[in-house]
């Protein structure tokens, strides 16, 4: 979710410096080896699920036929499962302990627990394995946590072999909290069935030996799973409107007041669905021919160094399921979905699925808002955004585009969100910001409200602080301390890392980095090192020094002006030897010469500027100097030493000095100490102060209104 601005604006549910750097192989920007986007994933799992929703008891009763194909060279003797809904079973679960019953601005209701029971599990031959299923706690040893289960198999699965299981389960949905559940007759059904973990072969994500990767459900962790094919039959009361992952293939009205809907989707790693009798269905289409102009195709092809065929998109059917009171905003949601399909598709590769469903959660279902599942996303808005002036806040658009963006990272690239959340959340925050800027402009991408404009960078840096140095970006999602730090280290700081990188390598090079990464790793589960390798390859430079500091380290960037001043060059006094011989220059003689220099405007000034690195992280920066009546001079500092002194002898005094004048280093925790003005017009500073005061007042009043 867009945590920077939305956490402030919305109540639930809305709630030349680099030339000195070491080169990688080759020089300049390399021509990365790029192949076409993969058409299909390696389908390791096949799910055929039948589920019935009891809207009164809020329970699911289902059966699941699961086929798993061993992707490794190992003989595998057990399967590991996620039973996510057990995270909401009681106060002893790891999820509830870590969250304290509060997450993403939502509070768990103590009388509405959730759970899942596997009532039967058999092999295709009929062997009953139900009693063999045991819970495991691989992360924290909490014996009360039942979100992971291990199943020994009667016969091991050889390399390339398969096993099929028939599973029956009953699940109790909690009141909406943390991505799933119900609110009255609104249902978001996510992480709801017994789901296999990932058996990682040796070499995948750097593993030395093959093994299961199946983490417990933590408060700040999301998901990781193999790609496969899903066929799901959902039976619900006929009065309910259903939306789900994938394409609806069949609809059958039963004789008991229910209807069964069949959905199918391949090349995905999860399946979620929603139900609500109050949904208003808004149908639309993204047209690759009408929603993208020939000129836009041409510009993007040139930007990326790709052919027109490679950047040409496909049509997509869009379904928006709106709450009746938000129907006036349906066009905004549709357009945001179109904008996401357009720009993510152009920049990173065509969307490979035929459908996209956008869900508007019911009032009070805050825990269901701002969430992503394959081909299905949840947004989040308020009736207040129906009316001027709050309709100028782009919250519905930002949430919709951000959640759609996850289709490209969480859903297609599919990193392990438990262990490296930034590869989804951070990269998606960066790419969402780029889309918002492309659509609305960089100065007003987030807000255009009563004369105030706010862009992505304005909101992004709100959480940056000299004290934000206690966690590494690359870390297990549940390890950030305090737990609220997850948003900064998984979302905001990685986006600043990427934008800082872009500011130095250039927009075109960064666009090619991102395109290459997505093309190469679609459907393949990369790790951080794979992204870093693409950066080094495409830029032709080794950025290991940068990523080691900002991704694996905890320190911050902070440059400041230590001292700055201009002093009149005094005429010499005393016994002076010169070509004319030895002369005695008295104080009166020197003073006279100084007055003459002033009158003739030939006086000189010694200017000294001391710049300092307060933070531990270094980054090359420019330092800009403005002398009275002269053009700005820019010099490069590699930023490595603690201090550097610049000296000048000029006929003019120094007016101002500024480190990183273009504000390329978004990671700098304090831009206020980057500059110093010695003389000249102070009105620009006053103007900025007024704008920020207005910003603060506007935000506070907005929060009050909501």
Where are these predicted regions, by residue range?
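A surface-exposed beta-strand-loop module
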Residues: 69, 104-185, 222, 640-654, ...
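N-terminal, polar/Ser/Thr-rich
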Residues: 16-61, 220, 544, 559, ...
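Solvent-exposed beta-hairpin/edge-strand motifs
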Residues: 78-130, 239-240, 626-631, 649
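Acidic/His/Gly-enriched intrinsically disordered linker/tail segments
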Residues: 300-305, 370, 376, 425, ...
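Beta-strand-rich binding/interaction modules
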Residues: 243-244, 543-544, 556-661
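Amphipathic alpha-helical substructures
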Residues: 326, 350, 443-444, 487-576, ...
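Hydrophobic helix-coil surface modules that form long, contiguous segments used
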Residues: 196-212, 218-401, 430-433, 442, ...
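Glycine/proline-rich low-complexity spacer/linker segments in large multi-domain proteins
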Residues: 91-104, 170-226, 230, 282-287, ...
